[in-house]
């Protein structure tokens, strides 16, 4: 046993002695050879290609890489090799190169135009604690440093218009500033946290002290401050603090560009009326979208003679003989009427879709009887729909109505392509379902819905969609017909007593009297003399 152990020890010693005799291959970096076992310090200029060769020097303890320009790669290598003391230099400009262990830095002598480039190099100085910038004419340099390293102590003297600027001031007068002054101040505003009031004096909307776009930038830079400016716009005296702006029936010729710029600077604005201003719908929509906290109202046109304001809650346009036939080509503007609750577009046989209903989330009553509508998909976005007269149309799919869980009254008579009412099975609020005798719903489905909705009256016998109890429920004592509860509410909501077929026609607009030639039956001359009215007055083929 002892003899075997002795043999093992002798064999191990032989192997060690054999290894000691092997030659160590040097590491060559830029023509200089380094012993990987004994090299602990190096001084060299490296590139991104040669820097990885330092990994082949496992005994390395210190590396002076001053003069090297691949700073991102050097910084990453140093972080990956914390056991090596890495030294390098950072060129801030041609005549200013500092070591990476710099703690304090004075950049006051750097030309202002070169300062931004110098600041970009500071992240390569991990030991840096304080920086002196000297006199600054704008705050961009200080902002850059604050964003790069919030813990860095930065000293500077802010100047504006040749004078030292007090960043702690609470009030500022800009009534006499130039565009250049405003641009320079813009960079300082985020640092003026105590600023509370900024006055721009008074003047016109067309010639403010600074451009409206610039003013909007300044307001965004100092949101805690109130900017004041009294100005005249289209003959109206206004201020930036106004909460309402009424421009209705004022002809505006720039598609609302000036109004859009001004209202963006009115943070308290909650109501803007631009009825009959001649601005196209798409431009008005841009103004509306630019003011999320403000109700923006304008006039839209649809059909060939219908019109209404976008804040209208009820629209009645069921007289093609006056307002023209409604069709997919001339009803698009209705999408801007996002507050509509009550909508009657019946008797329009060319009406083929309801795309505009996608934008009517508050819709409660809908009448599209005697139309060509076949797709109810937009109604899936109308969860508050209560009353729907869909009879005598081209329906073939009721699935979108499954989302209308508040639906109480539904008339689907005279829809010859409709064969499935299963989407209605979950409408537990439904109290009246008029199918009539001509809509081909399977008997089994009729019996099933009666079972599922025992409180719902289901009519499958009447030929006339509006006969019997759908609209009239007996007579009053004086012999007058008594409307059913659902229809009576519809009449109230739609204000049928005001106009039985249409009050969306142009001649019924009450605004014509104060702004026209003295009566409500003729549009004012300035409207009739417009070069172009963007509406198709031809009847669809």
Residue spans for each PLM region:
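Concave beta-strand-loop units of leucine-rich repeat
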Residues: 38-50, 59-72, 81-95, 100-121, ...
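Histidine-anchored nucleotide/phosphate-binding helix
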Residues: 54, 122, 189
